[in-house]
């Protein structure tokens, strides 16, 4: 869908999130920037374009952690991290949710390394691009989910060995 005024709509969304978290102390908040991974698997509308056009809105969010999907085609360049607030932790979507596609630890490491050109490793957590959508048309078996997460853990070990 197109919005008549995307800038205004995204500003409104940020204001709403900030109102939700306003006044709550001692809690870390996260926002997931969904690229509709399950919809891609089902062959539905794909969202293309990087995070650059919404960087100003992201930087206004009063949250601690952003999860950003980067396995999707058209997710944009990781150079966007040059412009992201330095106090954000980044949950880097680096494991595909696509059924039948199990990324190797090496593939995952290769997806993460470009982000580390811009982000201190202490700010990065690894995560799947999105949830594994149990019960949806993009259903991933529990055994496959386990294998995907095992490979994510192994990639994290390799990255810790390399980057500290």
What are these regions (language model features)?
Residues 1-164:
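Domain-level signal for soluble alpha/beta catalytic cores
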């Amino acid at each position: 869908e197109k919005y008549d005024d995307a800038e205004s709509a995204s500003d409104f969304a940020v204001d709403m999130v900030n109102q939700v978290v306003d006044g709550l102390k001692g809690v870390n908040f996260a926002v997931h920037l969904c690229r509709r991974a399950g919809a891609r698997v089902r062959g539905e509308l794909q969202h293309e374009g990087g995070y650059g056009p919404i960087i100003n809105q992201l930087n206004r969010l009063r949250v601690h952690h952003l999860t950003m999907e980067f396995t999707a085609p058209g997710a944009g360049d990781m150079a966007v991290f040059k412009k992201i607030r330095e106090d954000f932790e980044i949950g880097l979507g680096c494991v595909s949710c696509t059924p039948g596609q199990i990324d190797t630890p090496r593939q995952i490491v290769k997806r993460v390394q470009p982000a580390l050109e811009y982000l201190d490793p202490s700010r990065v957590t690894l995560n799947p691009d999105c949830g594994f959508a149990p019960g949806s048309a993009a259903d991933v078996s529990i055994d496959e989910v386990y294998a995907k997460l095992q490979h994510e853990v192994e990639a994290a070990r390799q990255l810790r060995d390399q980057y500290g």
